[in-house]
A protein has these predicted regions:
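Bacterial N-terminal signal peptides that target proteins for export
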Residues: 1-8
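C-terminal motif of bacterial Sec signal peptides marking the signal peptidase cleavage site
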Residues: 16-19
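Beta-rich interaction/scaffold domains
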Residues: 21-127
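N-terminal catalytic cores of secreted or lumenal carbohydrate-active enzymes
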Residues: 128-285
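Structural preference for beta-strand elements that scaffold enzyme active sites
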Residues: 137-144, 175-183, 250-256, 305-312, ...
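Well-ordered, non-membrane alpha-helical segments in soluble/globular domains
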Residues: 154-167, 205-242, 273-297, 321-330, ...
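Substrate-binding cleft of secreted/luminal carbohydrate-active enzymes
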Residues: 174, 178-179, 346, 358-373, ...
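Aromatic-lined carbohydrate-recognition surfaces of secreted/lumenal glycan-active proteins
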Residues: 250-260, 274-290, 307-317, 329-350, ...
């Protein structure tokens, strides 16, 4: 988890910018001429709890207050200085007191219309249990994106993203769905790979097939473009806040880390030096450069509703990679980021995640993929026993084979339901973090399918996730 550094302040709560709500008779964002451009002119703080920094965003209807380390703003008395004609509605008094250990809405009135603002406190690293915190990852959606082979299948349009941000139940009500989003890719689609040993852990791809510095840069260009998938995700979360509620926890973003292919010499240069990946120090240096780029670009994006949570190591096994990973892990943690890994069942080193200094490892059961369906009892017993013995979390897996009218010749929705059954039987749904492999936008495909069989599966998967989210305070 990264704590966004501000001047003398470590921010912990979300910057949930919200424009005017349609709920309770409010308007959805002032139209031109509806209200003054600046409804709130200033804020006076009357008690002892005073912020070190304040920002009033009248356009987004958001007030952001930064409090220095050690301050618990549970009893903040403030007075709003309002434009002529603007009055208080909720609360009706001015001055008034807010408990800013949680996000607080206030409602102003002007010319017969109501306008909702959110007051958000950015809190320091504080052990008080009442202080709103960055929530840990609970349900992480895998978002494959960036390679040319994904075009037309995994574009992560606004509509596709919306299906992953919120779940629409059978009555049409929306609920918060995934709390975390992992953006990753295996290759550029043109023969350059970000992931080594994908096809055979004992015979990794030739080093000349490794993606180079230009490929690493281009994938980040795509992810962090002003109109790219992360910016679109940020917008969809903001839109959902208007329709659903203010989430208790931030939505988390995790970005994959490519593998510097062992012995690769054509990657490129750093500080004028050609990288030679037979040298551990060069593999570490390239990885550090990439992590720094992720942080820089995420900060530059200036997302309103997302927090950068961590880095995901994209290789699913440790072959030829053990020597440098712990050093990279230390660097990632020095940046207040988490380090994630998702090895497949039977992968080289799948139980060594703690030695590699990963913060969390999700084990892939790989029950969905074999041509012949594995035996349910023995397969999941082996998976769950191993994961439990190693302290690992689990991945749920479903792909296009789960679609009723797929063209692949085999309908495997029953296997997805077996995951749901096993995860419940072994307590995964109540005790573990879960990552969700969904191939190319499968949640959206199931939701929007014309076939009832697919819609039913969508509801079954999402109902499980929503129940997990409710246990952590979301709805």
């Amino acid at each position: 988890m990264r704590l966004l550094k501000m001047i003398g302040v470590l921010t912990l709560s979300a910057l949930f910018a919200v424009s005017c709500s349609k709920e309770a008779g409010t308007t959805n964002g002032p139209q031109e001429g509806d209200c003054p451009e600046e409804m709130i002119l200033d804020i006076k703080f009357l008690g002892q709890s005073k912020p070190s920094h304040m920002e009033i965003d009248n356009q987004r209807k958001k007030i952001t207050l930064d409090f220095a380390e050690g301050v618990v703003p549970s009893n903040v008395e403030l007075k709003l200085i309002l434009e002529d004609g603007v009055t208080m509605k909720d609360p009706s008094e001015n001055p008034f007191v807010l408990d800013l250990t949680k996000t607080c809405p206030i409602v102003l009135a002007y010319a017969g219309k109501d306008y909702r603002y959110l007051v958000i406190a950015n809190l320091s690293g504080n052990d008080d249990e009442n202080v709103m915190r960055d929530g840990p990852v609970s349900d992480m959606a895998l978002m494959y994106y960036g390679g040319s082979h994904r075009i037309g299948m995994s574009d992560w349009t606004s509509e596709q993203l919306r299906s992953n941000v919120v779940y629409q139940d059978r009555n049409g009500k929306e609920h918060w769905l995934f709390d975390s989003f992992l953006f990753l890719e295996t290759s550029d689609g043109g023969g350059h790979y970000f992931e080594s040993g994908f096809d055979d852990p004992n015979n990794p791809r030739p080093n000349e097939k490794g993606a180079n510095k230009s490929d690493w840069t281009k994938i980040l260009d795509k992810y962090f473009a002003a109109d790219g998938p992360i910016a679109r995700l940020d917008k969809e979360v903001g839109n959902a806040i208007q329709r659903v509620s203010v989430p208790v926890y931030k939505r988390r973003v995790v970005i994959f880390l490519p593998v510097p292919f062992y012995r690769q010499t054509n990657w490129g240069t750093l500080s004028g030096k050609a990288m030679d990946f037979s040298v551990k120090a060069d593999r570490v240096e390239a990885s550090k450069w990439y992590v720094d780029e992720v942080i820089r670009r995420f900060n530059k994006l200036n997302a309103n509703y997302l927090a950068l949570d961590g880095i995901y190591y994209v290789a699913e096994q440790l072959t030829n990679n053990r020597d440098y990973i712990p050093t990279v892990a230390d660097y990632i943690k020095s940046k207040n980021l988490k380090f994630y890994w998702i090895p497949y069942w039977g992968a080289d080193g799948m139980g060594e995640w703690k030695n590699m200094k990963f913060d969390t490892a999700f084990l892939q059961p790989n029950y969905a993929f074999p041509q012949t369906k594995p035996d349910y009892d023995s397969h999941f017993k082996s998976i769950m026993n191993f994961a439990s013995s190693k302290g690992m979390d689990l991945e749920m897996e479903f792909d296009e084979y789960a679609l009723y009218n797929n063209k692949l010749g085999d309908y495997r929705a029953d296997r997805v339901r077996d995951y749901l059954r096993a995860f419940k039987a072994y307590g995964v749904t109540t005790k573990n973090k879960i990552a969700y492999y969904q191939s190319n936008c499968m949640v959206h495909s199931l939701k929007t399918s014309e076939y009832k069989q697919d819609n039913d599966l969508y509801h079954e998967i999402c109902t499980m996730i929503v129940e997990r989210q409710r246990r952590r305070g979301e709805d």
